[in-house]
């Protein structure tokens, strides 16, 4: 799952100009996706991110900024700044004045706890839990992925989250394309 915020603006986003405005050299654009009625930018912070951020523009003056709920702790802390900066870049002012109050340390803890609980619930009935915005195509976690680390459904939330981050940082989660090739023989 992911968390997202809407920003209303009456101008198109020039993503390269936004990156310059942010003055964060570690921000890297991974790819842009375009449909007839929307634009999507996917990016990460080099050396910090374990999942992708996204900005989605529906071509009707609304931007949706989102982050995967299993993102790194540092990215979850960075997320309100990203929303604030995009709003100021597009509108010259903060469109969401409660962003820092809402997305605080308590929100980070609740987001991680809720997402790990969702992961546990999913893995009790399904063999794979797919990340919402992975760095690699269709990355997922399974009980088999966690077992070598002594992690299972009864492990604590910090332990599960910690090993998930370890695997994601090393880009060691299996991907659906890996699974498909092993099934096809």
Place the predicted regions along the sequence by residue:
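Ampiphathic alpha-helical segments that act as solvent-exposed interaction surfaces
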Residues: 10, 15-28, 65-100
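Short, intrinsically disordered low-complexity segments
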Residues: 22-74
């Amino acid at each position: 799952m992911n968390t997202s915020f809407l920003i209303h603006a009456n101008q198109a986003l020039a993503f390269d100009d936004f990156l310059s405005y942010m003055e964060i050299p570690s921000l890297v654009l991974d790819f842009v996706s375009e449909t007839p009625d929307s634009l999507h930018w996917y990016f990460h912070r080099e050396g910090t991110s374990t999942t992708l951020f996204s900005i989605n523009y529906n071509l009707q003056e609304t931007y949706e900024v989102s982050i995967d709920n299993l993102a790194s702790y540092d990215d979850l802390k960075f997320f309100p700044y990203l929303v604030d900066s995009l709003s100021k870049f597009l509108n010259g002012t903060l469109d969401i004045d409660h962003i820092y109050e809402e997305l605080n340390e308590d929100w980070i803890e609740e987001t991680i706890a809720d997402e790990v609980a969702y992961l546990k619930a999913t893995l009790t009935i399904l063999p794979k839990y797919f990340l919402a915005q992975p760095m690699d195509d269709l990355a997922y976690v399974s009980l088999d992925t966690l077992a070598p680390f002594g992690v299972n459904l009864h492990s604590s939330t910090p332990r599960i989250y910690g090993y998930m981050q370890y695997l994601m940082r090393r880009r060691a989660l299996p991907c659906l394309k890996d699974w498909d090739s092993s099934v096809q023989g």
